[in-house]
Amino acid sequence: MKDGFLKAAALSPALRVADCTYNTAQIIQQLREAAGRGVKLAVFPEFCLTGYTCGDLFLQRTLQQGALTGLQAILDASRELDVVALVGLPLLARGKLYNCAAVLCRGQLLGLVPKTYLPNYGEFYEKRQFTPGSTEVETITVCGQQVPFGTSLLFRCREMPSFVLGVEICEDLWSALPPSTFHALAGATVIANLSASDETVGKAEYRRALVENQSARLLCGYLYASAGHGESTQDMVFAGHDLIAENGTLLAEAAPFAGGRAETELDCQRLEAERARNTSFEPSADGYVTVEFSLTPADAVLTRWVDPTPFVPGDPKRRAERCELILKMQADGLAKRLEHAHAKTAVIGISGGLDSCLALLVAVRAMKQLGRPTTDVLAVTMPCFGTTKRTRSNAEILCDELHVSFTEIDIANTVHSHFADIGQDESVLDVTFENGQARVRTLELMDTANRTGGLVVGTGDLSELALGWATYNGDHMSMYGVNAGVPKTLVRHLVRYEADIAATADLKNVLLDILDTPVSPELLPAKDGEIAQKTEDLVGPYELHDFYLYYVLRFGFGPAKIFRLAKAAFAGRAEYPDEVLYKWLRNFYWRFFAQQFKRSCLPDGPKIGSVTLSPRGDWRMPSDAAAALWLAELEQLFPHEG
């Protein structure tokens, strides 16, 4: 349960209809095996003690008592197990029969939750035997214990307060207003559904969508354990379709007829973070009773997949669709700004690198959207000391293929003059030497925009903004930053997508060569005609920084948890041992705090994804905040590296 991870399982053991002794033994066996795997939450199907298909046998006292005897045996077996378990059984209470979920832990019966919505249509006729549950919670005696009984029950783990369990049963989820909605608003971060959903054509897809959508709507983890092999096939077939979803994402699934076990880790901290930032999620716990329980804290081995590129969809079709959407968003944002400013030109500094390439592609799309000629895009290349033949050539070819206006301004003489003015020794290749060139380029672009009645389009991306890898009032400044919401890992895929759909072979080839060019500001003199300054050698791999950026901003995770996630995401990558992951994570935090002053005065630019750094929107942070707490937490991971 360290870092908010809860190992959970939805289990569908084989059973025999009305054979409580056999079913109990199956449940105990699977419960013990699950506990041995480190599972802390185990959910079994609806009526797993008796079988769902007992029909009018549910009204027989012998079956009812057999279920209670089985429940007592499970309680006894659970005393030695460090797991919360949920099992389904018929329960006679208040003179009526209820379809119940029993919640138990270490021999204690924590609560009994009756089903709210009883289906009485098609193949279902539960109202023939059962009574709907009430929201009112009362205490009844079951298995010699005083137990809360009612639908308005929550179960909270003392050792991990972010793990709060709510319960509903099968049809409850399929109703117009599921009880889980109220459970979540009352504080439940995890919903367990004990189900006996029969299999019909197309139902598995619908069921999966229900679980995914409910977990997204409630910002929760959702476990769905459905009855499987052994149920009566007199009129129906049950397939043991088990599902575990988290905030709209399916984490684990036992497909129909595939064995009946879905198991993964839920991230309760992540769910809490989502709710904390969502002001539309308004808590309401009126009428709810919360029962507390204890589990031994454990460091679960992560089996859930951690995406090493969270900004980039892995599926090629989805990635292409995402790229097209993002390019349209960027182009639309720029088109609106060009219209509003009555700009005659869109002025872009072109280096032959990725970011300026993407900005140019976006500007061309914007002009086409406005019905204007692409020659209204004015690309300016400004070679100086670090410019290489490769990047210069690529810039010219790209502009020619896109049919934009092109001009070259050699800034070397201006930079020499500027250095003479301020007394800069040009043999000293320091930050002044580098930044002086960047600021001269911005001066040229701004004045060119004034001369042509245009607007300077910024090229800097989200990753550079996070790291502060931009010259203050140099490339940091523009009149509209189209890439401000796009991280570097995504920039590469946007350019690659444009290469894939390029109208000509020459355009495709130049885009591919730009993709193959090392990322560089080209501010230091070239060595033998080659780039002498590679960004990722200086600030670290962008795929790592984008990973860190995502989890820092999207969920507010601490350094230790992010380090753990990085180890899982980049496992097997020889170039990323723990020491390297740590080094660049520490570098990320140091730069992120130190460079906030640059982000506090960002030009306008469109929000693209859920992570952005606009000081007018998603990220408001004082420029003089201290990073000490975060760096101290990192120091605990590698004291020798501090």
Regions found by a protein language model. Give the residues of each.
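Enzyme catalytic cores with a strong preference for nitrogen-chemistry domains
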Residues: 1-347, 365-374, 401, 406
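ATP/NTP-dependent adenylation/nucleotidyl-transfer catalytic domains that generate, transfer
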Residues: 6-7, 161-163, 220, 232, ...
